[in-house]
C-alpha cells in the first residue's frame, strides 16, 4: 500500500514513523517547510491543571501527554536518541495563592487516572531557589515532577529520520482519481492530511469546508551562561511561559495571535 502524508509536523512525522514499521506500507511525506506550528510551539506538556469544561479536550491532552512515554520507549528500542523530550517538571505561578491550593487539589484528584503527573508540592521561594536559582515574582508556587517539554524541530527531525520515509519538500495539491488519490502526478492508496491550519485550503478543492483557522505563535530565545538542562518549565499566570533547554538556552512564549492569518513576520 502506498500512503502519502501531507505535513511533517508532530502529527505527520509521528504517523510516518509508525507506518514505516509496517512492511507492506510505502510512505511518502510532503512538506513545504513554511509556517510549521510544531517548530513555533512552546512544547509544554502539562495538561493536568487545565480547568476547561471541555472533557473531550482534556482527554485528548491527557492521552497526548501519556503517549510521549510510549513514543520515547519505541524510539529507544530502535536505538534512536530522544533528546527532543525532557521531563524536568513544571512550576505554576498564580497571583492569588489560594489558586495554587485549588490546582493542587485538582491535580491530586486526577493523579490516579494520570500517574504521569508525578510528585505534587507547593514550594516556597527558598525551596525553588535550590532547583531554579534567581527565579523571582512569587512567594509560593505549585510543582509537578511529571511536567515536560518538547523541542519541536528536533522531534520532527528525529521521527522523519527514524522512519526512513522519502520527504518531498514542496507544497502538495491533492486530487481524487479513480485509482485513489493523486499528488504531483503520483497515485496513492491512502492520504493522511496533517496540514494543521492549512487543512481548510487543502479540502476546499475537494468540496469540503472545515472550521479551522490559523493562529500565529512567536517565541523569543535567550542564551545564558548557565547549565539549564534540569530547570523546570515555568508557567506564570498569562500566556508567556519560560521553557529552559539544554546548554543554557531559554525560550519565552509562545504568543497566541488570532487575527494575523498566515503572516510569518517576526515582530
Regions flagged by a language model, labelled:
Residues 18, 158, 162:
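Rossmann-fold NAD(P)-dependent oxidoreductase module
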Residues 148, 167-182:
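A conserved short coil-to-beta-strand element within the FAD-binding core of flavoproteins
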Residues 14-21, 32, 43-44, 83-84, ...:
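Active-site substrate-recognition segment that forms the wall
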Amino acid at each position: 500500500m502506498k500512503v502519502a502524508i501531507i505535513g511533517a509536523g508532530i502529527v505527520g512525522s509521528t504517523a510516518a514513523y509508525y507506518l514505516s514499521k509496517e512492511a507492506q506500507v510505502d510512505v511518502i511525506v510532503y512538506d513545504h517547510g513554511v509556517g510549521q506550528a510544531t517548530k513555533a510551539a512552546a512544547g509544554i506538556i502539562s495538561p493536568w491543571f487545565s480547568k476547561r469544561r471541555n472533557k473531550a479536550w482534556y482527554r485528548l491532552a491527557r492521552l497526548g501527554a501519556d503517549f510521549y512515554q510510549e513514543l520515547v520507549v519505541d524510539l529507544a528500542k530502535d536505538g534512536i536518541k530522544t533528546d527532543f523530550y525532557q521531563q524536568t517538571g513544571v512550576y505554576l505561578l498564580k497571583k492569588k495563592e489560594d489558586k495554587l491550593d485549588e490546582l493542587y487539589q485538582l491535580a491530586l484528584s486526577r493523579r490516579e487516572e494520570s500517574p504521569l503527573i508525578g510528585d505534587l508540592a507547593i514550594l516556597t521561594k527558598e525551596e525553588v531557589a535550590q532547583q531554579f536559582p534567581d527565579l523571582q515574582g512569587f512567594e509560593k508556587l505549585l510543582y509537578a515532577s511529571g511536567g515536560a517539554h518538547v523541542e519541536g524541530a528536533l522531534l520532527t527531525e528525529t521521527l522523519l529520520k527514524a522512519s526512513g520515509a522519502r520527504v518531498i519538500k514542496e507544497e502538495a495539491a491533492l486530487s481524487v482519481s479513480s485509482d485513489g488519490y493523486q499528488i504531483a502526478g503520483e497515485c496513492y492508496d491512502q492520504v493522511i492530511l496533517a496540514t494543521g491550519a492549512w487543512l481548510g485550503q487543502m479540502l476546499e478543492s475537494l468540496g469540503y469546508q472545515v472550521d479551522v483557522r490559523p493562529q500565529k505563535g512567536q517565541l523569543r530565545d535567550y542564551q545564558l551562561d548557565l547549565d539549564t538542562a534540569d530547570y523546570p518549565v515555568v508557567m506564570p499566570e498569562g500566556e508567556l511561559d519560560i521553557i529552559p533547554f539544554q546548554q543554557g538556552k531559554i525560550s519565552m512564549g509562545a504568543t497566541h495571535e488570532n487575527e494575523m492569518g498566515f503572516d510569518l513576520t517576526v515582530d
